[in-house]
Swiss-Prot record:
The keyword Amino-acid biosynthesis does not apply. It comes from the Eukaryota. Its main location: membrane. This is Prenylated Rab acceptor protein 1. Residues 30-54, 175-185 are annotated as: Required for interaction with prenylated RAB3A and VAMP2. Changing residue 178 to A: Retained in endoplasmic reticulum. Changing residue 161 to A: Increased interaction with RAB3A or VAMP2, Golgi condensation. GO terms for molecular function: GTPase binding; identical protein binding; proline-rich region binding; protein-macromolecule adaptor activity. The gene is Rabac1. It holds the Pfam family PRA1.
Length: 185
């Protein structure tokens, strides 16, 4: 607990507090904890995009080694690149924004309705899971018209290209033990 507060104080000194940067709408729970861990383990963006550290790998072995080590090292940065691409895709597609508004509006109405009373159809109580499935079914035509399927594949493709090319061409720093290893002759 004390170590966590020390890390938070260090981040606040730098002007970045993970708790203030996270939206207040995300409830405390597993999702918020995961996002806080990602935010805490993010690598400096300066080293992430340093142009002097990009070069072509010499062979396939080095390429594979770079891919594995960079994905492991910059995992949190890659998550935020992915989230940024999702945000870009949603903001630049007005129909997708409308479809998301319809879906989240229906979910919010159902949430308010369940606070007041249970929903009963044909003499049977409808569970919240079924209600949200109904909201998804109602908003499905909007997602289909907005081209949500192509947006999903665009985001996945753009993420793979960006992360794959960064991981392949970004030089890895040698680990502490690798610098001093000598091979027998």
């Amino acid at each position: 607990m004390a170590a966590q507060k020390d890390q938070q104080k260090d981040a606040e000194v730098e002007g970045l507090s993970a708790t203030t940067l996270l939206p207040k709408l995300i409830p405390s729970g597993a999702g918020r904890e995961w996002l806080e861990r990602r935010r805490a383990t993010i690598r400096p963006w300066g080293t992430f995009v340093d142009q002097q550290r990009f070069s072509r790998p010499r062979n396939v072995g080095e390429l594979c080694q770079r891919l594995v080590r960079n994905v492991e090292y910059y995992q949190s940065n890659y998550v935020f690149v992915f989230l940024g691409l999702i945000l870009y895709c949603v903001v630049t597609s007005p129909m997708l924004l409308v479809a998301l508004a319809v879906f989240f509006g229906a979910c919010y109405i159902l949430y308010l309705r369940t606070l007041q009373s249970k929903l009963v159809l044909f003499g049977r109580e409808v569970s919240p899971a079924h209600q949200y499935a109904l909201a998804g079914g109602v908003s499905f035509p909007f997602f289909w018209l907005a081209g949500a399927g192509s947006a999903v594949f665009w985001v996945l493709g753009a993420t793979l290209v960006l992360i794959g090319s960064h991981a392949a061409f970004h030089q890895i720093e040698p680990a502490d033990g690798e610098e001093l290893q000598m091979e027998p002759v």
